[in-house]
Swiss-Prot record:
Name under which the protein is recorded: Small ribosomal subunit protein eS25
Main location: cytoplasm
Gene3D superfamilies reported in the protein's UniProt record: 3.30.63.20
InterPro entries on file: Ribosomal_eS25 (IPR004977)
Amino acid sequence: MPPKDSKQKKDTSKAKKDKDPVNKSGGKAKKKKWSKGKVRDKLNNLVLFDKATYDKLYKEVPNYKLITPAVVSERLKIRGSLARAALLELLSKGMIKLVSKHRAQVIYTRNTKGTDEGAPEKEA
């Protein structure tokens, strides 16, 4: 019986020797390929208002909860500069209310009927 054990020990040592070179030599890693990148469609936004868009501005924009030039530009498909000018016009007419003004971002919200009428009474 003891000779059989010695043979098994020799076999296991041979197996370990065979496995070691395989573990040491790793396969070469694949080169990472460059991605093509994302392609964006060109925006074709209006530079000046047409009648339909101007009506939509007065009808829909005062009902938005959050009003910024970016939101108006995206929804009405107009340029950012045109959206800023339009929001200033709506503000001057009292249709929207200024929330925050920063050099880079202006935020407006819709006028609630109670605060719009109540504000002039307190001043007078």
